[in-house]
């Protein structure tokens, strides 16, 4: 009976695909934080997977699901101990309480690099940090606004190179090369001048 209750509680608070906390958990977390009036440092990262709908259309739903799971895995490994939520299909929020600014920004930088290398189109991020959390909603809006700016930059720059370049596929190719799946040959060039 206890296991059943625990399973139901988990299913009610977690996203079934990513294993992250869900939107309902975020609402409860936010309300508890606002009620508690905690005077702690707070870093927030808002993330949105780039071109997830296009990925689903071009390669099928399973490709999009794999991308969501990979992004979630990177977030969890990058922000162990933080509260990580999947708010909707391609939107994520990370809330890191009581972390130093330098540590928070270092984690964001490493996570961004990993997300760019492990997902087909990367994830647009916006992050904010406050030493003494005064207004969670304001800090959250700020992170979301910065994410939207980065999303627009992605779409502006994605017309040619980003459309055809994927770090995920490059990493697979390099791995296949290391495993001997390809034979590399040097083609000499001749310049009569």
Feature locations, PLM:
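PAS/PAS-like sensory domains
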Residues: 40, 120-122, 179-185
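Catalytic-core segments of nucleotide cyclases and related cyclic-nucleotide turnover enzymes
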Residues: 61, 105-116, 125-156, 170, ...
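Hydrophobic pocket-lining residues within nucleotide cofactor-binding pockets
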Residues: 49, 99, 130, 189-192
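Conserved long alpha-helical elements within nucleotide-processing catalytic cores of c-di-GMP signaling
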Residues: 9-13, 19-43, 50-77, 85-94, ...
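Active-site core of bacterial EAL-family cyclic-dinucleotide phosphodiesterase domains
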Residues: 160-193
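Conserved acidic
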Residues: 1, 48-51
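GGDEF/GGEEF active-site signature
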Residues: 44, 70-133
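Interdomain signal-transducing alpha-helical coiled-coil linkers
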Residues: 1-11, 23, 163-170
């Amino acid at each position: 009976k206890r296991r059943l209750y625990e399973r139901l509680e988990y299913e009610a608070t977690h996203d079934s695909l990513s294993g992250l906390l869900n939107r309902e958990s975020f609402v409860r977390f936010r309300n508890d934080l606002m009620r508690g009036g905690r005077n702690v440092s707070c870093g927030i990262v808002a993330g949105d997977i780039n071109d997830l709908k296009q990925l689903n259309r071009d390669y099928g739903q399973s490709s999009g699901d794999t991308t969501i799971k990979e992004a979630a895995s990177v977030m969890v490994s990058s922000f162990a101990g933080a509260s990580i939520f999947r708010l909707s299909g391609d939107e994520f929020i990370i809330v890191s309480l009581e972390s130093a600014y330098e540590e928070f920004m270092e984690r964001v930088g490493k996570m961004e690099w990993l997300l760019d290398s492990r997902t087909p189109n990367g994830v647009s991020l916006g992050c904010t940090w406050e030493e003494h959390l005064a207004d969670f909603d304001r800090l959250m809006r700020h992170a979301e606004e910065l994410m939207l700016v980065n999303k627009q930059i992605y779409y502006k720059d994605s017309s040619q190179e980003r459309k055809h370049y994927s770090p995920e596929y490059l990493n697979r190719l390099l791995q296949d090369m290391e495993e001997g799946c390809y034979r590399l040959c040097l083609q000499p060039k001749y310049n009569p001048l």
